[in-house]
Swiss-Prot record:
The keyword DNA-binding applies. This is Z-DNA-binding protein 1. It comes from Homo sapiens (Human). Phosphorylated. Pfam families: RHIM (PF12721), z-alpha (PF02295). Homodimer. Interacts (via RIP homotypic interaction motif) with RIPK3; leading to RIPK3 activation and necroptosis; interaction is enhanced by CASP6. Interacts (via RIP homotypic interaction motif) with RIPK1. Component of the AIM2 PANoptosome complex, a multiprotein complex that drives inflammatory cell death (PANoptosis). (Microbial infection) Interacts (via RIP homotypic interaction motif/RHIM) with herpes simplex virus 1/HHV-1 protein RIR1/ICP6 (via RHIM); this interaction may induce heteromeric amyloid assemblies and prevent necroptosis activation. Interacts with human herpes simplex virus 1/HHV-1 protein ICP0. The lineage of its organism: Eukaryota, Metazoa, Chordata, Craniata, Vertebrata. GO terms for biological process: activation of innate immune response; antiviral innate immune response; apoptotic process; defense response to fungus; defense response to virus; positive regulation of apoptotic process; positive regulation of inflammatory response; positive regulation of necroptotic process. It comes from the Eukaryota. Residues 407-420 have a biased composition (Basic and acidic residues). Residues 347-358 have a biased composition (Gly residues). Residues 68-107, 277-299, 339-429 are annotated as: Disordered. The Z-binding domains recognize and bind left-handed double-stranded Z-RNA structures, but not A-RNA, the right-handed double-stranded RNAs that are structurally very different from Z-RNAs. The second Z-binding domain (also named Zalpha2) acts as a molecular switch regulating pyroptosis, necroptosis and apoptosis (PANoptosis). The second Z-binding domain is essential for sensing influenza A virus (IAV) Z-RNAs. A motif (RIP homotypic interaction motif (RHIM) 2) lies at residues 253-277. It is found in: Cytoplasm; Nucleus.
Length: 429
């Protein structure tokens, strides 16, 4: 007779209870005691225990006696002991289970573990032990599982790496990055988790950051002329127009590789106006020294833009880091508080991507040699950049780096006045 599959939720609860009992005991526990403490049938408890044994979470020290930790090639856990006689058990137990440290010593070690993982990210138990001056993972296993039972740490089941526990990541372990395909005309992506990953490629009309505004106006009058081209008026602090961003603006890591991105704004508090088809004219590059650091060499480039949001950031000033490799970018701005207006027209100053007020630039008299490539760095960004390294990617068009100084917006707003393809990322990636 086929056995019904176990309930994953109950198994997870039972596993947490087992870890808690073993942690509080501080020494091997008999199966009968586990049955009593966990209030579960012996058969069900055995199934969970042997599954946890395969996952190196617990191990057998003697028949029907369990303790924390497991064995693997790196020695991440106490070795299984085959006790030949009861007389040998005390000595072997002493060799397997380290002496219980005092409360102050244990608390200090937990603080060291937490600080190490916070500074260095997910690590295996052996690396943590060596960083704290110990030799084997079993020296810290008891502390790690005790901290896990108190929801201070969490462990990835596949990599066996320990990390700081975050409630928003609960139940999402071992999942791959979010892949979003743009099937709809407009995609609104708001993902606030600290370890969230979003992958998007070959899209148009994109803003990545906080406090952004995007509009598109392609409504034509009966005589064929275009309607008014202006941003809608928005009163400061109007909760009906701004987004519902509540959490402080956090840092963003954006990776783009082999992507086609047109009409893109990277940064915060930017405004984009789309009037029909994008122009083919050169961009107006404003003078000045925008506070955006950049490094470029060949087909790969990285940028960092500081977030100008009001208020304080408990973990220091957050930044948006953009890494691009082998991308096609057209009509793009990188920085904060920029305005970009894209209008239909012939080659000339009709298309603007700049950090000014969105007005056309006076570059109609530019020499033909200047219009061959519409992408370059201002000469004073971060560190000197030679002309041979001035291209970010194989092809960039209408590229602007820089910030404006006006006060940053406090939310993100999207206005759609006609059907178009676009994506808006706000509230943190």
């Amino acid at each position: 007779m086929a056995q019904a599959p176990a309930d994953p939720g109950r198994e997870g609860h039972l596993e947490q209870r087992i870890l808690q009992v073993l942690t509080e005991a501080g020494s091997p526990v008999k199966l009968a005691q586990l049955v009593k403490e966990c209030q579960a049938p012996k058969r069900e408890l055995n199934q969970v225990l042997y599954r946890m044994k395969k996952e190196l979470k617990v191990s057998l020290t003697s028949p029907a006696t369990w303790c924390l930790g497991g064995t693997d090639p790196e020695g991440e856990g106490p070795a299984e002991l085959a006790l030949s006689s009861p007389a040998e058990r005390p000595q072997q137990h002493a060799a397997t289970i380290p002496e219980t440290p005092g409360p102050q010593f244990s608390q200090q070690r937990e603080e060291d573990i937490y600080r190490f993982l916070k500074d260095n990210g997910p690590q295996r138990a052996l690396v943590i032990a060596q960083a704290l001056g110990m030799r084997t993972a079993k020296d810290v296993n008891r502390d790690l599982y005790r901290m896990k039972s108190r929801h201070l740490l969490d462990m990835d089941e596949q990599s066996k790496a320990w990390t700081i526990y975050r409630p928003e990541d609960s139940g999402r372990r071992a999942k791959s990055a979010s892949i979003i395909y743009q099937h709809n005309p407009i995609n609104m992506i708001c993902q606030n988790g600290p370890n969230s990953w979003i992958s998007i490629a070959n899209s148009e009309a994109i803003q990545i950051g906080h406090g952004n505004i995007i509009t598109r106006q392609t409504v034509s009058r009966e005589d064929g002329s275009a309607g008014p081209r202006h941003l809608p008026s928005m009163a400061p602090g109007d909760s009906s127009t701004w987004g519902t961003l509540v959490d402080p603006w956090g840092p963003q890591d954006i990776h783009m590789e082999q992507s086609i991105l047109r009409r893109v704004q990277l940064g915060h508090s930017n405004e984009m106006r789309l009037h029909g088809v994008p122009s083919e004219g050169p961009a107006h590059i404003p003078p000045g020294s925008p506070p955006v650091s950049a490094t470029a060499a060949g087909p790969e480039a990285s940028f960092e833009a500081r977030i100008p949001s009001p208020g304080t950031h408990p973990e220091g000033e957050a930044a948006q880091r953009i890494h691009m490799k082998s991308c096609f970018l057209e009509d793009a701005t990188i920085g904060n508080s920029n305005k970009m207006s894209i209008s239909p027209g012939v080659a000339g100053p009709g298309g603007v991507a700049g950090s000014g007020e969105g007005e056309p630039g006076e570059d109609a008299g530019r020499r033909p040699a200047d219009t061959q490539s519409r992408s370059h760095f201002p000469r004073d960004i971060g560190q000197p950049i030679t002309p041979s390294h001035s291209k970010l990617t194989p092809k960039l068009e209408t590229m602007t780096l820089g910030n404006r100084s006006h006060k940053a917006a406090e939310g993100s707003h999207y206005v759609d006045e006609a059907s178009h393809e676009g994506s808006w990322w706000g509230g943190g990636i």
